[in-house]
Design a protein with these regions (language model features):
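Start-transfer (signal-anchor) and selected internal transmembrane alpha helices
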Residues: 1-31, 219-227
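Membrane-interface transmembrane helices that cradle and orient dolichyl/undecaprenyl
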Residues: 120-126, 161-179, 183-187
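Transmembrane-lumen/periplasm boundary regions of multi-pass, lipid-linked membrane glycan transferases
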Residues: 50-53, 189-190, 195-321
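Short helix- or helix-capping micro-motifs
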Residues: 131-136, 184
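Membrane-interface alpha helices of multi-pass inner-membrane proteins
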Residues: 142-143, 175-192, 316-321
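Transmembrane-helix motifs of polytopic, lipid-linked glycan transferases
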Residues: 98-122, 160
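Short acidic/glycine- and proline-prone juxtamembrane loop motifs at membrane-interface regions
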Residues: 140-154, 191-193
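Extracytosolic helix-loop segments that constitute the early lumenal/periplasmic catalytic or substrate-binding loops
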Residues: 28-29, 47-72, 76, 83-86
């Protein structure tokens, strides 16, 4: 007797893919670069010293090391490093240095998860695994993912941003806007104003595409601004009250806009240097991106996701320079 099954109810053939192999690869990739490793770069030693100084002198708002304040960015990363050291070392007995390195491991794990979900949201089922595999294979991520550095948190903000854009149309406006605002605020606390400026411009540029220019997305952006501005005002306001001179010094040295126009001739003269390094650190992702652009060039503007990808590439290159 023949039995009719609707298409969605028909039994699907078992996939030969094994997702647990990707999880195992990610765990091996993360752990082998952290366990038993000394601090390689001077930036790692400096950040680790500031983290220890926070726990010693309890200057949380403006960490200082031998009376030298930390003004590279907000102390957001140092706060998390100090909290991880206090919890893992003080309560679990893990060595202080390894406790801070574990923070990098946990943040990179969240990055892989969010980027995989973003890849699935943009490109469809099973494409998230491909996204994570490509990211793990990039040479630059090997350096980024195994050091005591605020850069994994910057990648976390970009991962959250990408994930929200891939799912915003399925989320309530308030939830999507809040998460997008948190991503912007996290980027600000790690890398100051320039990265937020580029993310906001990118978000607004998407409105030039008819599929992005809709009521839901516009309301998400408005809600994101409504949450983003108060979030960044917390640290700025506290610094203005307690350390106004250091706040001014931080703004002058890290805003980026003051030195942008005078440095344009210098950037043009060293364009080859930046292109060379970017091509090395982004290998092999940039080759795959170039092949994809050639294959789907007719969809670059018609499809909203491909339009976003092209904007990402252009703005990412400009920001790195």
């Amino acid at each position: 007797m023949l039995t009719y099954h609707r298409l969605e109810q028909k039994p699907q053939p078992k996939s030969p893919e094994k997702p647990w192999l990707l999880v195992l690869l990610a765990l091996v990739w993360l752990w082998t670069g952290i366990v038993g490793r000394d601090l390689w770069r001077s930036e790692e030693i400096q950040l680790y010293a500031y983290i220890k100084a926070i726990l010693h002198n309890e200057h949380w708002l403006l960490p200082t090391l031998y009376h030298v304040p930390y003004l590279n960015s907000s102390p957001f990363y140092l706060w998390w490093g100090a909290l991880s050291q206090w919890f893992l070392n003080g309560l679990l007995g893990i060595s202080p240095r390894f406790a801070v390195q574990l923070l990098t491991l946990m943040v990179m794990s969240i990055n892989f998860l969010l980027l995989g979900l973003a890849g699935r949201g943009f490109l469809g089922f099973r494409q998230g695994r491909v996204t994570v595999s490509i990211i793990i294979g990039c040479i630059g991520i090997v350096i980024l993912g195994h050091q005591i550095s605020p850069l994994p948190f910057l990648l976390l903000s970009l991962s959250i941003y990408s994930y929200v854009l891939s799912r915003y149309h399925k989320w309530p406006i308030l939830a999507a806007g809040f998460t997008l605002g948190v991503a912007w605020a996290l980027a600000f606390y790690i890398a100051n104003f320039p990265i937020v400026f580029f993310l906001v411009i990118l978000s607004l540029l998407l409105l030039a595409h008819q599929q992005w220019c809709n009521r839901h997305y516009i309301l998400v952006l408005l809600v994101a601004f409504a949450f983003f501005l108060p979030l960044i005002s917390l640290w700025i306001g506290a610094m203005r009250i307690s350390y106004p001179l250091y706040l001014h010094l931080w703004f002058v040295t890290n805003s980026g806009f003051i030195y942008f126009l005078p440095s344009l001739p210098k950037l043009a003269a060293h364009a080859f240097y930046y292109v060379k390094n970017l091509s090395w650190y982004a290998f092999p992702a940039w080759i795959l991106a170039l092949i994809a652009i050639i294959k789907v060039k007719s969809l670059l503007y018609r499809d909203k996701n491909y339009f976003l990808f092209c904007c990402w590439i252009v703005f990412g290159f400009i920001y790195i320079i």
